[in-house]
Amino acid sequence: MSIEVKDLKKKYFKKEAVKGATFTIESESIIGLLGRNGAGKSTVLNMIARRIEKTSGDITLDGVDLHKNPNAMHEVYLSSSDNWFPQEYKFKDLLAIYKVTYPEFDMKFAQDLIKVFDVNVKQKYSKASTGYKSIMKIILALANPSEYIFLDEPVLGLDANHRQLFNKKLLEAYARRPRTFVIATHLIEEVASILEKVIVIKDGVVTEEVLVEDVLRKGYVVSGASTLVQEYVADKKVLETDQIGNFTRSVVIGAIGEAQPGLEFSPLTLQDYFISITRKENE
C-alpha cells in the first residue's frame, strides 16, 4: 500500500507554489519531507489531505484517486501548525472528540503521552503556549490510528528536551502500531536519526527522493587550512565549500580517502547534504 503523487501542482493566481511534485509515500515507514521555509512543503501536505484543492496532478492510494475514496481519506491525518481546533475547547474535549471520530484512537497511549509531556488537559487550547499547542497536536497525531500520519513542523515552539522526547515517542507510536509517518520540517539534524527516507522539495519542485542510508554514503566532509583543503579537493567533485578566514570546510562526493596531515575527515550528515543541495546561488 502506498500513496503516489504525480505531477502535483498548485497555482495561486500567477504564482506557482508547487510546480509538478512527483514522489511515493510507502506504507509503514518514517519519511522526512525536507525543504526550506517557503519551499512548498505545507502546500503539498494540505493538498494530499485535501485542505486545499490541487490545481492539477494525481494523488492515488493503491492506484485509486485518494480524494474520490472517503474510506481512503479516513486513513490520512494531517497535523499542521494551523489552528483548526475550536479555541474554547479544553484538551480533554479534543480527546473525547477524537475517540468518537476514530474508534481505534489509542487512548491509553494518549494518556501516557499526557503524563510524560506534563499536559494540563483542563487548559483551554486558546490559553496554551505555542509549545503546548504543538504538544497537544503531537499527542492527537501519535495516538491516531490512521495509516498515514502527516506532521507539518511538529516541534514548533518546543524546547530541546521536548523535541528529543517527540522523536522517542514517535518511534514508540510506530512500534505500537506500524504505519507511515511523514515529517515535514526544515530542522533536519534533530529528526535525521529516525528517518528512513527523505523527499527534498526546493522552490516547489521535488529534487531528491532517496533513502537516508544512501545519502550518508554519497560523500564526506573535509576541513582544515584553506590551502590544504583546496589542494585536496582540486580533482574531486565538491558539493559545497565554506570558508572562514584561513579555515575551509568542503562537502565532497565520493568515498573518503586515506588520512592526510593537516586535514580532518568526517562522515556526511543528512543536514550537510540538505544544506548543500538547497542553498541558493547568492548565499
Question: Would you name each region that the model predicts?
Answer:
Residues I149-E153, L158:
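Catalytic Walker B motif of ABC-type/P-loop ATPase nucleotide-binding domains
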Residues E240-E283:
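C-terminal coupling/interaction segments
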Residues N71, S80-M136:
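ABC-family P-loop ATPase nucleotide-binding domains
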Residues G57-N71:
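Conserved ABC transporter NBD signature motif
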Residues I31-R36:
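The feature captures the beta-strand-to-loop junction immediately N-terminal to the Walker
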Residues A49:
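Helix-to-loop junction immediately C-terminal to a conserved catalytic motif
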